[in-house]
Amino acid sequence: MLRRLPFYPLLFALFPVLSLAAHNIQEISVDLVYRPLLISFLVGLVVFILMQVLLRDWPRAGLITLIFLLFFFTYGQVYDKLKSLSPFTLSLFRHRTLLPAYGILAAGLMWLVWKKLKQPAAWTFGLNIFSIYLLIYPLFVISSNIVQQWSADAALKTSTLRPVSGAEKPDVYYIILDAYGRQDVLRDTLHYDNSPFLDALRERGFYIADCSQSNYGYTEYSIPSSLNYDYLETLGAAAHKDRIALLKHGAVRSFFEADGYQVVAFPTGWNITEWTDADLYIDYEHPITALTEFETLFVKTTVLRVPIDLRSVNQNTASRKDLRRLRVLSLLANIKKLPKVDGSLFVFAHLVIPHPPYSFGPDGAPGQFQRYDATDQEIAEAYIDQVKFIN
């Protein structure tokens, strides 16, 4: 089988997705890999079968399919690499020059295999073995991460705190507004007075910590620390996988679960802060054309980078900003309904706002701020618009 049947094109079709997933496994959920993996496999399968129908020669069809896959899946990476070499290559290698050159190279190699290669079957065994070898490392990285995550989660299932029996159990909301500035910082740095909103909260019985400071400067460090009542150094969470386990199944969550609370969570667009295994995980309605951030990253490594950069993609395709708007608006709409849910709730709501990219105007309309060359003043105004909206 290894010597006669060229199955390597199908394994090569899987490699780009698995390799990218392994490289980013600390930032993504494994379920984000399934759709692009299936599509990549189908691309390889369809091209392979089509070549066999045309050529009536499995070994030759396999080699031509491999050339096509290499062209299709590496174009975006080659494009980025060439543009990063020097200012000269930045202007030289544009899509209008690189795409034809890359296409001619691929077509030339295909022609050589079709017309000139005498014994295509001689390549089958070596390429079959190499394709298997190619998948070993990414599959090992991905599976190891899954096992480590399971182990870390299991170790955190038991909280050191115990609920007080018989006590009243009100709903508890832990709402995080990512990158929301303190009043004095907003006033002194951005010249925005947020005191009317804070005073309104005080009138409703809220406590405002006027001189509060974040425990850490990054979400991956800050939230796990907060959800476990201690600093990460004390908790022994130096590794990324340990911090994620502390975030998703930490002491606070375990405490409420042990006391009979239902855990409620929402999608954030970032796997690290998504509690998809919550008792009630309230997702939003995804546009059928929407790509996840992992899928977008993957697509940009392929030849599909060209229509993306040329902005010729169907206008119905949801952008990253559009999806962020949908997530935020869905969370705000659904969190209002939770008081009607029976039982005691612990609600974990991480809203990536006013954190950029800036998706909202002050009244909630889509924000118009998109330019990369914006001035500091324009950036400040866009940030304040997010604050005004979320208030």
Model-found features: residue ranges?
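Transmembrane and membrane-interface helices of multi-pass
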Residues: 2-150
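Membrane-interface amphipathic/re-entrant loop segments adjacent to transmembrane helices
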Residues: 27-28, 317-318, 367-377
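Short, charged/polar micro-motifs that form catalytic or ligand-binding hotspots
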Residues: 36, 162-166, 187, 242, ...
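Cytosolic-biased juxtamembrane loops and peripheral soluble domains of multi-pass membrane proteins
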Residues: 118-129, 145-169, 189-192, 196-197, ...
